[in-house]
C-alpha cells in the first residue's frame, strides 16, 4: 500500500505502517484509522482497496505530510532565525535549543568533536 509517496511495510499493522509517513505518528495514525473505519490490528497486506483509498483521501485532505510538513518545519526554524530570538540563535549556531547542557553531552547537535589546542603537560626535571 502506498500513501503520500511512501510504501508501507506489508507485514506490519496499519497503525504502525502509517507512522512511516513523515508527519504521522501513532496518535494521528489512530485518528485516521478511526475516521476511515479500519481496525488498528489489521495488517497492511489485509487492507482492501476501498479502505486504502479512504485512508489516502483522509491523509491528503486533512493532514500536512511528507514534503509539505518538512517545508513548514524548515520555514518555522527560518522564521526563528530571522527574528533573532534565542531559539533562532541556537539553531543558527547548531546548538541545542531547549536548554540542555552543552559543556558535555551535546554531540548530536554539535557533531563530531573538534580538538582544541590545550595546555602542554609539564615534563619531569
Curated annotation (Swiss-Prot):
SUPFAM superfamilies: S13-like H2TH domain. Transmembrane segments: none annotated. One of its GO terms (cellular component) is cytosol. Residues 91-125 are annotated as: Disordered. Keywords: Ribonucleoprotein, Ribosomal protein, RNA-binding, rRNA-binding, tRNA-binding. InterPro entries: Rbsml_uS13_C, Ribosomal_uS13, Ribosomal_uS13-like_H2TH, Ribosomal_uS13_bac-type. The keyword rRNA-binding applies. Pfam families: Ribosomal_S13. One of its GO terms (molecular function) is structural constituent of ribosome. It comes from the Bacteria. GO terms for biological process: translation. Located at the top of the head of the 30S subunit, it contacts several helices of the 16S rRNA. In the 70S ribosome it contacts the 23S rRNA (bridge B1a) and protein L5 of the 50S subunit (bridge B1b), connecting the 2 subunits; these bridges are implicated in subunit movement. Contacts the tRNAs in the A and P-sites. Belongs to the universal ribosomal protein uS13 family. Part of the 30S ribosomal subunit. Forms a loose heterodimer with protein S19. Forms two bridges to the 50S subunit in the 70S ribosome. PANTHER family: 30S RIBOSOMAL PROTEIN S13/40S RIBOSOMAL PROTEIN S18, SMALL RIBOSOMAL SUBUNIT PROTEIN US13M. This is Small ribosomal subunit protein uS13. It comes from Chloroherpeton thalassium (strain ATCC 35110 / GB-78).
